[in-house]
Structures are given as C-alpha cells and as structure tokens.
C-alpha cells in the first residue's frame, strides 16, 4: 500500500478538477480525499495499491479537459488504512 499527498497548481479550480479526481480515484479503487485550497491549488491524499496511486498521479498531471496543470508536488505519507472511500472534503 502507498499513500501520497499531492498539491496541484495551475488552472485547477472552477474546471471540475475535484469531481474528476474523485471519479478517477474511485475508478482506480483508491481511498482518500480532494479539496480546493485558498491559494488556488487543489490538494489531495490518495491511498491504495502503489501502481494505482501512480496512475492517479499521472492523471493529475493532465486533469480534466478544461484544466491547465502547471505542477504536481507529491509527498509520500504513512499509510493509514482508515478510509473506505474517496471524496471531496473541505
């Protein structure tokens, strides 16, 4: 298992980035959350099989059709094993 935190910069708010991230993470069978930050970035934590987490991070570099991703900063975290779904949080 692998858990990461990612901060996504660019035009990532107001373009369905969070909802699309939820869809992609659920499709990959991951758990965690995604939220908008006040600085205009999107933050997410995702946990699951290492190859599936890597697939989500690869997707994050493009995001949904109207997004423009400039940077995805990734931090490795300790696996928690406490979540059961992937959702939008505040």
Task: Please provide the spans of the model-predicted regions.
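Intrinsically disordered, low-complexity, mixed-charge
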Residues: 1-90
């Amino acid at each position: 298992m692998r858990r990461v935190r990612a901060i996504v910069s660019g035009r990532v708010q107001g373009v369905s980035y969070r909802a699309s991230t939820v869809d992609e993470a659920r499709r990959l069978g991951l758990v965690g959350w995604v939220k908008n930050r006040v600085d205009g970035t999107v933050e997410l934590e995702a946990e699951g099989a290492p190859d599936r987490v890597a697939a989500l991070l690869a997707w994050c570099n493009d995001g949904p059709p109207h997004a423009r991703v400039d940077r995805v900063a990734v931090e490795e975290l300790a696996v928690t094993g406490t979540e059961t779904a992937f959702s939008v949080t505040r």
